[in-house]
């Protein structure tokens, strides 16, 4: 629907409300979905009219639309259910349970079971979580507070919660103006015309006696005006524009070349004053009406119904954008200037953005293409992704050529979508990627867009067609709009004559538009109509400029730097396209492009001269500065969180400084104290079920900016809102007597999770139609997580793929659905060269390309490169002797491979030129492990000599070597295969030997180790980090699997072989996992390759989705290892 049609609906709503057609008003609100009347919604809820509540809501959202909507409907139906129980109306309660609440069972079966169990209680308040449930009225009011917060946070209600302000009886006024205009065109205008209908145009009848009509009387232009409508005002917005000029007020003044079409030809024939620009304040406040004819008010028509509804009222003044700005009560003390956190990303940070809902979650992008997500409250990096092309086959040839020429890539911009469910990343070469974000730190690949030729310089999210879109701009001088979820292109805007540097989408009066700036300093504006730019203005400095609105969308600012280093921070008068205010304080020539941000509709901040500078928006002089305790670059990047309580600033040496004001410090202290209290809670709480309130997701965290994700209990705050079944006022805190538990008591009462039968997990044996079986010596997931690749001791590969089905629509790997064993139609096998040797005695090795298209593998013979789709051998190289024993791709160049050899050397091989660039010597036995750290710029190797070596990537010289330490219960020098894998933080190393698991730092110092004992006494056969870096999975030679805490190496769960090996396949302990593979996206799923050739996928049950619980901490301290979900260095094990 066009914006004018939408505004017409608002006029009709106002008219219906003034005429007291209340039911019709709310019906139109629901059917049009333009305005959600919160007052009407509150009345329905407080009156318990649940059917009407859901009926009204249905016009705006459905249960399955998003997690906010799901939570809204859940709370309503839950309250209806509890009220039925409170009335002891069991039949009605059962009906609600089956018809209304059953839908939520598919999202959380445990929740549904617990709600069902309330039927068995005489009084549901006997349930501990509902013990504070009061009477019906108070419960409804408490729930209503929660619902209002959910509705305000729900993106589907964007721009629908406020009614636009305009004069009362606006529709009558427009009709009166139209009648006056029609009367002016009468050939024989009468002094007191009689308007009897609106169905046809007015025309005075000719005089019957041939006399001319008397001259017109000077009467009022409009009739009596009723009282103001009951709709709440939305804020400073312009009124409905006269039909003569439909251009939006917010952008009209910039549109020097705009030619709006006139919908009625008769209007163009009128006096010039009728078609003047709509941004003229006098015209807005005093619309001109022809005065050559007497005024007509259609209320004078012969309509008894209308006359009955007439009432004298008071005129009100029109408010319009940019007229004035309300006074702000904030002071300089509200600025975040105190350094409270120092984080290190590991590489230079190029972009920052705080989560729009979770105030302490920070997204960062770096100069090596990495993105990371930090929980600044706990100082933990909860997610990490290194750059990779997800599907190289779908990329354009220019992109493939660019990556082949230079694999280095940087993040130019990363940011969150408005509701924080999606994040977007723009790279310095062609690509934009979007991820779906889950608050437990999980990132799921969503869309990969080959967006521009050259770099993608900026991105932004918008809702041009009620669906989330992502706007991109690039070096190819284009601006494009894409569907954020599918990556489908929607619009292309061209007109810039230089690379486009930044984009700034916005909306005013339901008109959506985009500002863009190019590196030649040109500012342009675009509507979503592909009719070209509406603006062509010059930015101060004529070079790199970014634009941003204040949080309330009423003030527009830009900040830029010229080629000479002169920086400019200005406020624009957006209705006139002129600079309104220029801020002082840039005294020296900037050494980089100055970045800026706004907060609280009051303050501006920019990074310049090695400090952060602050301004009051209404004062051109600098307000204050902070050097953040030193260590800032010349032009630091910075970003406020939504509330303005925290400020993230980039620092030297890959650092990020977090600054806070009083509110921010209080927020972080609360997070710390609650995390501490949670760690000291009563031991009996460890095995209790989580509160029902958040089991549908993390929606409830919109209740407070201090809420954290409930899906990560190790970082969650104690719930202060109602647990599950009855929401409480978040301002109330439970009256709980603290209990101090002795640490030794915790250790004594904690119990290891020991899974001994298949009923406590999900396990699936991969189907295998091959006639022969051999040991699985290598196993790995593809990078997208939808396939498993195994290499047997007979040199033959096997590939399993999960297919998309009705039951598994996403085609994700899971133990719930059997995958297909993949093989080309011609039946070809993917078999390694064996060079007439015995592959059973050879050391096999395998490595997968980042795009999952090719696999490199060897089994004692030549190294073969296979096409994963056709199984064809693309090439072979490195004929033995010596044979290759380990393969690892260089993190920055896929054409360079580190190859561990049987003769103890490491060869750095360039595939493109078929040449060994370097040969590294330092081991005395064959190489059994290689791992790269891009951030540390090093390669770590391990060998059958139980030695670790660190090598510099730059010159390939050896930096250090060390033999792994022998456990206390083992004498003599260690020998045997040793594996290495870098943690996601790129600084800690997991070292795996049959005698131990050990964590080393980058200096090859052993930080801690664990040796087989007690519950897991057998030698270790394999081990690997989980994809989020929080767990370590280890296989043992007796068939058991151990799940360890990655940071402390404490055992949290033991999985007996009887739990995942079918009884028919068991062979008395002789079968064991030779290799363990971790899923790249699901941290609690693993695959194990067995000594009998079988492959099993193992994961916990949905009802208990984690492997046991974390063991209690002792009084010792350990170096912290950050958690990050991206498996940046997935080892070949």
From Swiss-Prot:
Tetramer. Interacts with D53, probably via the EAR motifs. Binds to AP2-1/TOE1, AP2-3/SNB and AP2-2/IDS1. Interacts with WOX1. Interacts with MOF1. Keywords: Nucleus, Repeat, Transcription, Transcription regulation, WD repeat. Pfam families: LisH_TPL (PF17814), TPR1-like_2nd (PF21889), WD40 (PF00400), zf_topless (PF21359). Transcriptional corepressor involved in branch formation regulation, presumably by suppressing primary branch formation and promoting secondary branch formation. Required for the cell elongation in the first internode and pollen development. Probable downstream regulator of strigolactones signaling important in axillary meristem maintenance. Acts in auxin signaling and is associated with the regulation of histone deacetylation. Essential for the function of miR172 microRNA and its target genes in regulating panicle development. The keyword Calcium does not apply. WD repeats lie at residues 344-384, 451-492, 495-536, 539-582, 586-625, 630-669, 771-810, 838-876, 879-919, 922-961, 970-1011, 1015-1054. The N-terminal TOPLESS domain (TPD) (1-210) binds directly to a 12-amino acid LxLxL EAR motif peptide. Coiled coil: none annotated. The gene is TPR2. Residues 34-92 form the CTLH domain. Residues 1102-1133 are annotated as: Disordered. SMART domains: CTLH, LisH, WD40. Disruption phenotype: Semi-dwarf, with reduced male fertility and shorter panicles with arrested branches and abnormal spikelets. Transmembrane segments: none annotated. Gene3D superfamilies: YVTN repeat-like/Quinoprotein amine dehydrogenase. InterPro entries: CTLH_C, LisH, Topless_fam, Topless_Znf, TPL_SMU1_LisH-like, TPR1-like_2nd, WD40/YVTN_repeat-like_dom_sf, WD40_repeat_CS. Residues 4-36 form the LisH domain. SUPFAM superfamilies: Nucleoporin domain, WD40 repeat-like. This is Protein TOPLESS-RELATED PROTEIN 2. Expressed in stems and panicles. Detected in roots, seeds, leaves and sheath. Expressed in the meristem and lateral organ primordia. It comes from Oryza sativa subsp. japonica. It is found in: Nucleus. GO terms for cellular component: nucleus. It comes from the Eukaryota. GO terms for biological process: inflorescence development; regulation of DNA-templated transcription.
